[in-house]
A protein has these predicted regions:
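Signature of extracytoplasmic/envelope-associated structural regions
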Residues: 1-424
């Protein structure tokens, strides 16, 4: 029986292998945990009808289709170091690993180029419904949230060119209208047993010879041979040749085998260090005030303003089916800090028009003695834009709006993430 429960969905990416060029698929090397309610990437098909054309009818009668792009969201409710490393590496653009015991520290920084690295993704829906691979995925936005009494969270908005590959195939076979079996042209049907092969045939329909409409055809068995032979119920009683359309999963390509998932413990916000007002000297964050139980939440936001478009294609490689242009229009980074208003510090920083650094570090469990999973964020130059006073329940609080700026020497940010993955 076909299994279409969302718990069986799988999502894989080329986390450690960026694409060499636009619309050039890479090898999938990591399966990622997936929120059960999330479809991380889907096609956004583009079409228009002819309602603005005079065509002799009141209502439109034609649809013009012109390709697709891709879009999706990838939220992680219990974020691990690997999720930060993957999303920030592709969101900011540069990641440099260095060995650290049996693990690695990944130093992630913004690139100057307006062309961010792309990765390949693939999605399995249910257990037997379909698999689809997407080329050239890009991180449009990232939001990382550290809120009281919760797990660290991270989510990304994704954009893609719309180039995709399915594990499905539609094949037309010409046979008699009263045929009892159909033989595929060359392919086997995927599956190691009879029940799986039968599930992997999604539909057979026949064109009625006399009237021209399509009718569904029953089928009961699929052979293990190459090409496969499918046993059907004869749709008619005459020998007249006609077309049968068969929608099925052929013997799968290598990309259809999803890679292993990396297992890490999630990060808990109770193990968060947050400093504001200090200075980064390139190796150490000096000074600053450590914020502790007063913090309700801290949220980091990255926006890349990714533009994915159809442009002229002299080679004709895209056939107008997917975009051939992806550019980052300008990076914006902000921090939202919600805290109890126990002091006048944020107000004074605004009065003084102060530029200063912010430092965060979320520490997880050890992966070896003395070495922990961690996510560390350094922002050398920040400014508090506003911090309106509010009443949160029965306490006075502040919602700080902080802009991350680009420092002349150290740039806008540096993330250092430790885990056991060799690179992103």
């Amino acid at each position: 029986m076909k299994n279409f429960l969302a718990q069986n969905n799988l999502f894989a990416v080329s986390a450690g292998l960026k694409e060499a060029a636009l619309n050039t698929e890479q090898t999938l090397n990591t399966s990622m945990l997936l929120n059960i309610s999330s479809i991380p990437m889907a096609l956004d098909r583009r079409s228009e009808d002819n309602s603005n054309e005079a065509h002799g009818k009141e209502e439109p009668d034609t649809i013009y289709r012109f390709g697709a792009t891709g879009a999706g969201a990838y939220p992680v409710e219990r974020a691990q170091a690997q999720h930060f490393a993957f999303l920030l590496s592709y969101g900011l653009g540069a990641s440099a690993p260095a060995a650290w015991g049996t693990g690695f520290k990944h130093t992630i920084t913004p690139i100057a180029s307006i062309y961010n690295p792309g990765f390949t993704s693939a999605l399995r829906l249910g257990n037997t419904i379909m698999k689809r691979r997407f080329a050239s995925n890009y991180i449009d936005t990232v939001k990382a949230t550290f809120a009281k009494d919760s797990w660290a969270k991270i989510e990304a908005a994704l954009k893609a060119t719309g180039k995709y590959t399915d594990n499905m195939l539609k094949e037309t076979v010409n046979a008699a209208y009263n045929a009892l079996s159909l033989t595929l042209a060359a392919n086997a049907v995927h599956g190691g047993d009879a029940a799986t092969r039968l599930d992997n045939v999604h539909r057979i329909r026949v064109k009625v010879p006399t009237t021209g409409e399509w009718q569904e055809v029953t089928y009961s068995a699929v052979s293990a041979a190459t090409p496969a032979v499918i046993t059907i119920g004869a749709p008619g009683g005459v020998i007249t040749p006609t077309d049968y359309e068969i929608l099925y999963v052929p013997a799968e390509a290598a990309w259809c085998t999803f890679p292993a998932r990396v297992t890490e413990p999630p990060l808990r916000v109770s193990n968060l260090l947050l400093k504001i007002g200090g200075k980064w000297d390139g190796s150490v964050f000096n000074g600053g005030r450590t914020l502790d139980a007063e913090v309700e939440s801290m949220e980091y936001n990255l926006t890349n303003q990714m533009k994915v478009e159809f442009r002229t294609d002299p080679t004709g490689a895209t056939s107008g089916k997917y975009a051939n242009y992806a550019m980052r229009e300008g990076r914006i980074q902000t921090i939202a800090l919600n805290r109890e208003a126990r002091d006048f510090i944020l107000e004074q920083m605004m009065i003084d028009e102060e530029y200063s650094g912010i430092y965060i570090k979320a520490t997880g469990a050890e992966f070896e003695s003395g070495k922990n999973y961690f996510v560390e964020g350094i922002f050398p130059r920040c400014a508090v834009l506003k911090a309106p006073l509010i009443v949160n329940g029965k306490v006075i609080a502040q919602a700080g709006d902080i802009r991350i700026l680009e420092d002349d020497t150290y740039g806008s940010c540096k993330w250092i993430i430790a885990n056991k993955v060799s690179g992103y």
